[in-house]
């Protein structure tokens, strides 16, 4: 569901939900989201800006409160995950195995407020990193499906 419309996307099922993970590029395939965004340097820049905003902006306080005292581990894990999710190197899987996103997020209270703050923070990071607007919109749609699936509390 979420992968539909992403460039080069075939989709990938994670925990029963389709995500934007792309297939590896071939000579005949379209570029992946990983390619279109600019590879590892661009993904790292996006992740770093996302967590910088989470730390700085009061609008993301509820989201920040769900995280630990420091964001270093979260930065690395999201970077590793997004690289593979967008069709690049599978750094996360190589280190930790299958993402099991919902299971890994169950210990953290995630409701509509946290979901919406995550999405707003990522959208702001994509704008500030000047991600192509068409790609950013497609990623935002895929992020919504995954973020909504992470909810484990009301409100």
Residue spans of the language-model regions?
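Long, hydrophobic N-terminal alpha-helical segment
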Residues: 35-43
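Short amphipathic alpha-helical segments at helix boundaries and their inter-helical linkers
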Residues: 143-155
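A short, structure-level motif marking secondary-structure boundaries and short turns
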Residues: 36, 106-108, 151
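Compositionally biased, low-complexity flexible segments
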Residues: 1-17
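Heme-based O2/NO sensor domains and their adjacent alpha-helical segments
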Residues: 23-31, 44-127, 133, 140, ...
């Amino acid at each position: 569901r979420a992968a539909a419309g992403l460039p080069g996307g075939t989709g990938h099922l994670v925990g029963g939900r389709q995500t934007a993970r792309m297939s590896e590029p071939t000579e005949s395939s379209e570029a992946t989201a990983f390619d279109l965004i600019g590879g590892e340097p661009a993904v790292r820049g996006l992740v770093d800006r996302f967590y910088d905003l989470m730390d700085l902006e009061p609008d993301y306080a509820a989201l920040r409160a769900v995280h630990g005292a420091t964001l270093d581990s979260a930065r690395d894990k999201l970077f590793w995950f997004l690289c593979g999710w967008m069709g690049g190197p599978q750094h996360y899987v190589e280190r930790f195995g299958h993402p099991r996103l919902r299971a890994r997020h169950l210990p953290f209270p995630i409701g509509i407020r946290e979901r919406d703050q995550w999405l707003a923070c990522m959208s702001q990071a994509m704008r500030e990193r000047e991600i192509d607007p068409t790609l950013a919109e497609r990623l935002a749609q895929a992020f919504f499906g995954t973020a909504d699936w992470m909810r484990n509390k009301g409100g």
